[in-house]
């Protein structure tokens, strides 16, 4: 059980859990708009993190970090001047630093007028081979991209059909999708 700590300042909370193989330590990250904390299982203590200068915003996407290549990744949603934008930011567990934004796939929609009027569903997760992001919209187009190691994004799946809104949990063996 983790030692108690106050909820970080700033509303929407994000969190993640992962193994730092360089330091041989399990780490937990908890953050909000203005404060972020890390817990080391090895030391049994929490400490405040620095290094993410601007507030972090989550409007719709789940707040759980996805572990990929030794870093936790989150989808970040921002609202500016009537539109929403989406980016991926990450936290390197070994260096204990927030990283530059990871580019999304070229065809992944990056701005929206409204989550609701655009009929939007997007998310991110990890599979055995890497990170994946998905998108579906009012046209009933559903697309999944995967990223392995340092390479670019590859479109894994693209299909049009009636979707009733769900979050993709993972893949089955052989690349067959399990909604």
Tell what function each PLM region has.
Residues 1-179:
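Short, conserved recognition motifs on repeat-domain binding surfaces
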């Amino acid at each position: 059980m983790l030692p108690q700590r106050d909820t970080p300042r700033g509303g929407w909370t994000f969190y993640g859990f992962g193994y730092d193989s360089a330091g041989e330590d399990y780490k937990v990250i908890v953050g909000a708009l203005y404060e972020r904390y890390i817990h080391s299982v090895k030391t049994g203590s929490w400490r405040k993190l620095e290094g993410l200068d601007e507030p972090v915003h989550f409007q719709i996407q789940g707040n759980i970090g996805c572990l990929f290549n030794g870093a936790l990744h989150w989808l970040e949603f921002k609202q500016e001047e009537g539109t929403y934008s989406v980016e991926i930011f990450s936290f390197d567990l070994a260096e204990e630093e927030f990283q530059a934004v990871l580019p999304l796939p070229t065809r992944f929609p990056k701005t929206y007028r409204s989550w609701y009027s655009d009929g939007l569903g997007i998310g991110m997760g990890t599979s055995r081979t890497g990170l994946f992001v998905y998108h579906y919209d009012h046209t009933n187009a559903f697309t999944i991209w995967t990223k392995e190691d340092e390479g670019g994004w590859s479109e894994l799946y693209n299909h049009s059909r009636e979707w009733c809104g769900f979050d993709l949990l993972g893949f089955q063996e052989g690349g067959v999708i399990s909604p």
